[in-house]
Swiss-Prot record:
Pathway participation: Protein modification; peptidyl-diphthamide biosynthesis
Annotated protein name in UniProt: Diphthamide biosynthesis protein 3
Function: Required for the first step of diphthamide biosynthesis, a post-translational modification of histidine which occurs in elongation factor 2. DPH1 and DPH2 transfer a 3-amino-3-carboxypropyl (ACP) group from S-adenosyl-L-methionine (SAM) to a histidine residue, the reaction is assisted by a reduction system comprising DPH3 and a NADH-dependent reductase. Acts as an electron donor to reduce the Fe-S cluster in DPH1-DPH2 keeping the [4Fe-4S] clusters in the active and reduced state.
Gene source species: Bos taurus (Bovine)
InterPro entries attached to this UniProt entry: DPH3/4-like, DPH_MB_dom, DPH_MB_sf
Cellular compartments annotated: Cytoplasm; Nucleus
Length: 82
């Protein structure tokens, strides 16, 4: 079991759209970071690249769903393999 330095809500992070990464200040002077892809995959641990501290990210997993929603095919249509 990991020992977290803190628990921080995702709203308190800074978001960089170019890298799709969330950042939060670390006591060592660097930043904890976690990517949008990590959050979509259900990860909730942000790490600091400069020290061994980690924090737990508190967020609504439903807001970070991976992939797109595809409607189910109608039952009265024949499926054709492409």
């Amino acid at each position: 079991m990991a020992v977290f330095h803190d628990e921080v809500e995702i709203e308190d992070f800074q978001y960089d759209e170019d890298s799709e990464t969330y950042f939060y200040p670390c006591p060592c002077g660097d930043n904890f970071c976690i990517t949008k892809e990590d959050l979509e995959n259900g990860e909730d641990v942000a790490t600091c690249p400069s020290c061994s501290l980690i924090i737990k990210v508190i967020y609504d997993k439903d807001q970070f769903t991976c992939g797109e929603t595809v409607p189910a095919p109608s039952t009265n249509k024949e499926l054709v393999k492409c």
